[in-house]
Amino acid sequence: MRVVLQRSKKASVTVDGEIVGQIPFGLTLLVGITHEDTEKDATYIAEKIANLRIFEDESGKMNHSVLDVEGQVLSISQFTLYGDCRKGRRPNFMDAAKPDYAERLYDFFNEEVRKQGLHVETGKFGAMMDVSLINDGPVTLIVESK
């Protein structure tokens, strides 16, 4: 499992002109799932993200988690995170999980994030989405389970 995490001042996701998910501040997650991922990977990433200290304390050090600052999570599925661009001019997406498996694991992942005590908004799995955010910092990290 691969997640691109962005600390966000605000974020929203729109499908067909309608906002389907939005947060006032917290983390925006782009979530990629490969065919080898399991529920164990999803749980590991959910716990890691909830407790990752990437929000600043009073002295400006990254010392607080999204839980500590009472932020929220906007989670967006993104199979293109497993695009292999090493050969040719078109990405190869063979490492991305098949949609039915990926959707089940993506839903499980979001529930695991919720179990950590976070409010989670989502996009629409498999849809073309417009994602808007103000990246705070900018702070952008890649979190992987393997």
Curated annotation (Swiss-Prot):
Main location: cytoplasm
EC number: 3.1.1.96
GO biological process: D-amino acid catabolic process; tRNA metabolic process
Any single Pfam family the record assigns to this protein: Tyr_Deacylase
Enzyme class: hydrolase
GO CC term, one of those recorded: cytoplasm
Catalysed transformations (reactions): glycyl-tRNA(Ala) + H2O = tRNA(Ala) + glycine + H(+); a D-aminoacyl-tRNA + H2O = a tRNA + a D-alpha-amino acid + H(+)
Keyword RNA-binding: yes
Motif (Gly-cisPro motif, important for rejection of L-amino acids): 137-138
Subunit note: Homodimer.
Listed HAMAP family: Deacylase_Dtd
UniProt record similarity statement: Belongs to the DTD family.
PANTHER family: D-AMINOACYL-TRNA DEACYLASE 1, D-TYROSYL-TRNA TYR DEACYLASE
Domain free text: A Gly-cisPro motif from one monomer fits into the active site of the other monomer to allow specific chiral rejection of L-amino acids.
Its biological purpose: An aminoacyl-tRNA editing enzyme that deacylates mischarged D-aminoacyl-tRNAs. Also deacylates mischarged glycyl-tRNA(Ala), protecting cells against glycine mischarging by AlaRS. Acts via tRNA-based rather than protein-based catalysis; rejects L-amino acids rather than detecting D-amino acids in the active site. By recycling D-aminoacyl-tRNA to D-amino acids and free tRNA molecules, this enzyme counteracts the toxicity associated with the formation of D-aminoacyl-tRNA entities in vivo and helps enforce protein L-homochirality.
Name this polypeptide is given: D-aminoacyl-tRNA deacylase
Protein species of origin: Bacillus cereus (strain ATCC 14579 / DSM 31 / CCUG 7414 / JCM 2152 / NBRC 15305 / NCIMB 9373 / NCTC 2599 / NRRL B-3711)
UniProt gene name: dtd
